[in-house]
């Protein structure tokens, strides 16, 4: 372990940031018997628990229930007129987030991790200066420091958020009323989820995505299926498009929609949500002073999360790559194992599952068909439709499919891609299959309970197996 140069080491490990990566790292370090502290300038749990993953999913659940309640007669249920109460949905969402944050506090206390409320700055000599809420300063010494400060929304010139008419996902989580109309700039995970939520809540939503398709990193067939589903739900989607001349007025926002090959048109909406990605939360940390190198707004690290400065590690969004909570948690274990003198295996990004929680939901892991072909594989592809699933029919959720990509030479699975009701709940099996090279035959020969949506995975594997002879 790196020894402190100028400060008596008060801690073996100091973690900056308490999101999924930070609190997992602190707890993991404590389990090794390392004296550990965690510094958080806002609320325990970080963005994920308080302003990201958790409250977003709570809001999406409210929209799902409302959507189902609008057509209950199909299921033999009569409820009369239904309406959407955004204030109550937001209240429930905030309560869910609060409960999760309290859960993080409990876990840290149970692990005997010292929690410090304040803003941390790296000072050199293995030091951390923490400015407390009352303005007092506490100097810490640590043999090892893990930076887990997460990310902040990326700001695009001309689309600077004002918190009212031009908003980020944070404001979108706590709006006081459903806007009559909304422009969502960005067709990635955040944009897709927020667009679906507000469309179901009653807003007229338009998505503007610069890339040729929504969710551009996903399987093209999945992206196109999602676009069709959104358009069927009344969401307007413009891909290969951008906004110019954005103007804010008392009544809302206007902008010029520019699509290559088409004449510009004017868009008007009550508000505009900017969801164009994030950048690492590195400002004010003092990285330059301690020799931590950054690149394109993120901290540079090796495969074991070591930065360019001895004894300093970085995990999660601030490290770059896939910006996912479960990636941060996995990196937390890697960093702590490295600190403990182990030789942890670096994380393989293609094996990290990716999920988008609109309905239909999208989930994927491993290589797309195109990526597998480009990597030199001779591929075999298997498909199955949710419409053929007994469980999907029973639930009235027929939309969606499973696409599995295999190495035709070995039969081993290379990637899995799904869209459909609760598709995100099926990705664990596919992640396991990709991680350990399970073959199409192995999936087929595994008994899948009936009736479950997981049978769609087996059917897709069977389809691929037949194509392999």
Swiss-Prot record:
Binding positions for FAD per the UniProt entry: 40-48, 57, 120, 317, 325
Keywords: Cytoplasm, Disulfide bond, FAD, Flavoprotein, NAD, Oxidoreductase, Redox-active center
Binding positions for NAD(+) per the UniProt entry: 186-190, 209, 275-278
Reaction equation(s) it catalyzes: N(6)-[(R)-dihydrolipoyl]-L-lysyl-[protein] + NAD(+) = N(6)-[(R)-lipoyl]-L-lysyl-[protein] + NADH + H(+)
EC top class named in words: oxidoreductase
Compartments, record wording: Cytoplasm
GO CC annotation: cytoplasm
Active site: residue positions: 450
SUPFAM superfamilies recorded: FAD/NAD(P)-binding domain (SSF51905), FAD/NAD-linked reductases, dimerisation (C-terminal) domain (SSF55424)
Molecular function as annotated in GO: dihydrolipoyl dehydrogenase (NADH) activity; flavin adenine dinucleotide binding
PROSITE patterns: PYRIDINE_REDOX_1 (PS00076)
Main localization, broad class: cytoplasm
Domain of life: Bacteria
S-S bonds: 48-53
Cofactor binding: number and manner: Binds 1 FAD per subunit.
Required co-factors: FAD
EC nos: 1.8.1.4
GO BP term, pick one: 2-oxoglutarate metabolic process
PANTHER family registered for this protein in UniProt: DIHYDROLIPOYL DEHYDROGENASE, DISULFIDE OXIDOREDUCTASE
Other facts: The active site is a redox-active disulfide bond.
Family stated for the protein in its record: Belongs to the class-I pyridine nucleotide-disulfide oxidoreductase family.
Subunit structure: Homodimer.
Function noted in UniProt: Lipoamide dehydrogenase is a component of the alpha-ketoacid dehydrogenase complexes.
Name the UniProt record assigns to this protein: Dihydrolipoyl dehydrogenase
Native source organism of the sequence: Chlorobaculum tepidum (strain ATCC 49652 / DSM 12025 / NBRC 103806 / TLS) (Chlorobium tepidum)
Upper lineage: Bacteria, Pseudomonadati, Chlorobiota, Chlorobiia, Chlorobiales
């Amino acid at each position: 372990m790196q020894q402190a140069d100028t400060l008596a080491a008060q801690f073996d490990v100091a973690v900056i940031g308490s999101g999924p990566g930070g609190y997992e790292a602190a707890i993991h370090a404590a389990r090794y018997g390392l004296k550990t502290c965690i510094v958080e300038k806002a609320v325990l749990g970080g963005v994920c628990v308080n302003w990201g993953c958790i409250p977003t999913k709570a809001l999406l659940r409210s929209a799902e229930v409302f959507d189902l309640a609008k057509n209950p007669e199909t299921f033999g249920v009569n409820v009369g007129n239904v309406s959407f109460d955004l204030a109550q949905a937001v209240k429930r969402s905030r309560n869910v987030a609060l409960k999760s944050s309290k859960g993080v506090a409990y876990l840290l206390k149970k692990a005997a991790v010292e929690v410090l409320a304040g803003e941390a700055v790296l000072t050199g000599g293995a030091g951390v200066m923490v400015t407390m809420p009352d303005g007092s300063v506490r100097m810490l010494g640590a043999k090892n420091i893990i930076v887990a400060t997460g990310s902040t929304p990326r700001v695009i010139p001309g689309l600077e958020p004002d918190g009212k008419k031009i908003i980020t996902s944070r404001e979108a989580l706590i709006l006081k009323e459903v806007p009559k109309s909304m422009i969502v700039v960005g067709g990635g995970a955040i944009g897709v989820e927020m667009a679906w939520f507000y469309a179901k809540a009653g807003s007229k939503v338009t998505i503007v995505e610069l890339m040729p398709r929504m969710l551009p990193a996903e399987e093209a067939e999945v992206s196109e299926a999602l676009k069709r589903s959104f358009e069927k739900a009344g969401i307007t989607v413009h891909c290969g498009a951008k906004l110019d001349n954005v103007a804010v007025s008392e009544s809302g926002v206007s902008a010029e929609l520019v699509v290559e090959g088409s004449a510009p048109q004017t868009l008007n909406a009550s508000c505009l949500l900017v969801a164009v990605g994030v950048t690492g939360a590195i400002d004010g940390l003092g990285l330059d002073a301690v020799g931590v190198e950054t690149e394109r707004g993120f901290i540079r690290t090796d495969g074991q999360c070591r930065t360019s400065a001895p004894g300093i590690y970085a995990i999660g969004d601030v490290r770059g790559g896939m910006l996912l909570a479960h990636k941060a948690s996995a990196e937390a274990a890697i960093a702590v194992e490295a600190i403990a003198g182990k030789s942890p295996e670096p994380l393989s990004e293609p094996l990290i599952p990716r999920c988008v929680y609109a309905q239909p939901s999208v989930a994927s892991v491993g290589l797309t068909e195109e990526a597998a072909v480009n990597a030199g594989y001779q591929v075999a592809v298997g498909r199955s439709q949710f419409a053929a699933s007994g469980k999907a029919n029973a639930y009235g959720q027929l939309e969606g499919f499973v696409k599995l990509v295999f190495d035709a030479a070995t039969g081993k699975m290379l990637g899995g891609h799904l869209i459909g009701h609760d598709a995100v709940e099926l990705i664990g099996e596919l992640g396991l299959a990709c991680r350990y090279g399970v073959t199409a035959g192995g999936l087929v020969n595994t008994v899948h309970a009936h009736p479950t949506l997981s049978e769609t995975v087996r059917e897709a594997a069977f389809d691929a197996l037949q194509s392999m002879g």
